[in-house]
């Protein structure tokens, strides 16, 4: 990629903006060296990393870059074996912490979206939490070592504190004793030693060592002789403290040296992540999207914006190239935005090929080019005595030497600066040569000959920048398929040039040229009208979609209200059923209690009648609930092997027998075999009948009719194996039937059958608890089971 083109397209300004989003000097240096990558694979990977970082910013917020530093100098010194300063060690620990936290930041649950490229980068992080912890534990600030850094340092500092207290007590006493000889009744410190400010005329009155003199010479700072030994002890402790601090720093630095590979790797990854997230922050700030990348020369920029133009003023442009045509000729008046269009296309390509998201709409397409050549602006060189034309031509010669089918070439005012006829002919020749090589070209021009060239040459298309003649201002919108016109006569007329001069000028233009310009104007007007109609249609569609979404949300809300009401009603019905069944079980217990107490069978009969009425009422409620949940007609006939829906438990079952004369059939639900009536069977249609399986499981034991399951089972006369099978089957039916308590009659006999049944009940999934019958229930001849 030519450095000159990169400079002309102002990619360096994008780099400077990008640096503002970094946290470290190292990341800024990465950006300084940023250039388009050498392969389409690299471009896609670096765009993907930017896209992933962009998503993470949205979903997880700011990355953990707090307190991250450029530690290259510290790493260099540690690698050489030097002892690092506390601040350098702290910064290294901060970078290690950042690397460790980043692994946590990028971690995601299985069901969440993964971040392939960033996860691959973070896999290289060593994570050195022990070193990180030791440094943070030992160092509290840039120049402050913590007491807890070592037990030796702690003891030294404690002794130092005690000595300082002793010296201060002693010197305060001396201040009071020598107060008449002192400049002020205070003590001070000179060279880490406690001294008194003695008036120079009384220096003989305070025996001691002179350490300093005031600037006026009126005061001598004297260390009293009685403090010399104490001050010496303090000085010794301070030297020991310094030596211990140096030892601690040396040990920590040695640990960095021993793990230098991990430290360097973690630091480099953190700086790379700093760079990647700077790209993502830039994309967020400039409303960028990730384009689709191809290497086939196909370009489709949708509403691209030049990132260096004020976002409140920039006009988006849409540019296509590479499919229907490979060359685009942009014509129109000066200051109309032609050059901005060239720079926008070129800069967006440089950004994308450097792994940056682009300021354009979603679904934009960018092609990977080996080279982007740009001849834009006035490159006149006074030093080299080159004219504008010569300067441009020198640049064009370089382009012609290197451009091929993998090149994007941008020409601004190709052929300008010389005789119009020769310039136009030369421009057409250059364009045609590059087109035949397969290069993709966008060129701006004033020449009508180039408009005609685009009209007659296959693979070349005209375009123009729209100009509002009413306001004499360009709109900066790009119109592909329509050649531009200079609008010189219209502009001159509106600026006040007399009509007779304009008319005379028109007479000097051939009728053919006039008709051509009128045709262009007509095409422009139609194109503008078509675009306005398209924008209006798009706005109407968006408005319609917005209204549709609003009504769909309202409908969904109403549906939720209806569903919630239905759920509440069903829940209430089930609560009634549950309470009523509990009441039925209570009645059964009352009956047994009355029997034990010796009440007449008449009382039992009345209670049984009450229980029967209650059961009938429950059955009615259950049947209504089943009908609301499972609409549809009952099956008239079934055969063995049919898969049907048993409505009472809302579950698919397999028919095992034909209906008997009462309509009862044997069906299998999972591992259980159940007798059901054909009226309770429905046609099974895929998953349509599986209405909320989680709720079904909870309601199974409530939805089976009580009248189908007896409250007791008699095992007398059965052997152990037959009894176990019978009880297991019975408990399944009792559980599904919603019975709270049942009685198993096994008789007293030898007790073998009772023991077998008791052992079985201990681990049965439907049994909450069990006990032997009480007096009046059958005693030890029965077992009473409470169902879960």
UniProtKB/Swiss-Prot annotation:
It comes from the Bacteria. ATP binds at residues 332-339. It is an enzyme of class 3 (hydrolase). Residues 713-788 form the Smr domain. GO terms for molecular function: ATP binding; ATP hydrolysis activity; ATP-dependent DNA damage sensor activity; endonuclease activity; mismatched DNA binding; ribosomal large subunit binding; rRNA binding. Keywords: ATP-binding, DNA-binding, Endonuclease, Hydrolase, Nuclease, Nucleotide-binding, RNA-binding, rRNA-binding. Its EC number is 3.1.-.-, 3.6.4.-. It holds the Pfam family MSSS. HAMAP family: MutS2. Homodimer. Binds to stalled ribosomes, contacting rRNA. Belongs to the DNA mismatch repair MutS family. MutS2 subfamily. This is Endonuclease MutS2.
